[in-house]
Amino acid sequence: MNLTSKREVLQKFYFPLAYLLFLLQAPPNVITLTSLILGTASALAYYYDHLLSAFFLFLFSGLFDLADGEVARLSGRQTKFGAVFDWIADKWVDGLVLGIVGYFYAGPVWATFSVTLSLLHSFIKPVAYAEIGYQNRLKGKILDPLEGIGFFGRPETHFTLLLFTLFEKAHLPLGLSEGIKIITLLTALSLLQRILYLYKNYGKVDDE
């Protein structure tokens, strides 16, 4: 699937919010902080089984997360701190939401695997940056082949979780228990795809 590689298509959905925030002169780091707060509130809403609130809080957390970088580019306020802060906020929200949803809807084992695999799927990129040395940037983002490798990343995780939240709210046969298991399994396969790509392209002794 890899929605990340189709960023220009996704931009149509979040750019209006980003442009509004740009016109309001909202600082990019404040937008990132807002995304973090909304994501944390979403995790708490899942904990208290307020599924509709959790759905919208998680949705807007994702939209603000997409908007912060766009606002930074539009306003010329891109900083390395902002990029790091955005990354930390992403992992905080993902870990908290997947952990709580996994624990209470699928059990502690699935929660552990879902959080661990999600973090590994992301952490493999900065490790690759450090070891392989990707440096080129486009619009503030590091250009690397892994951006297009792995069919199930953060956008797919969010979309799946939001979809199964609605299923759970509607009391359909497939709910959040099944959703978190699907996310975990697909993330594992996507991580394996990234590892195999790195092995194929950088596994030779001459490349070390």
Feature locations, PLM:
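Helix-loop junctions at the membrane-solvent interface of multi-pass transporters
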Residues: 25, 45-49, 167
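N-terminal membrane topogenic signal
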Residues: 9, 25-30
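A feature for the membrane-embedded catalytic helix bundles of lipid/isoprenoid biosynthetic enzymes
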Residues: 1-18, 87-208
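Membrane-embedded alpha-helical segments that form the functional core of polytopic membrane enzymes
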Residues: 30-81, 108, 113, 172-188
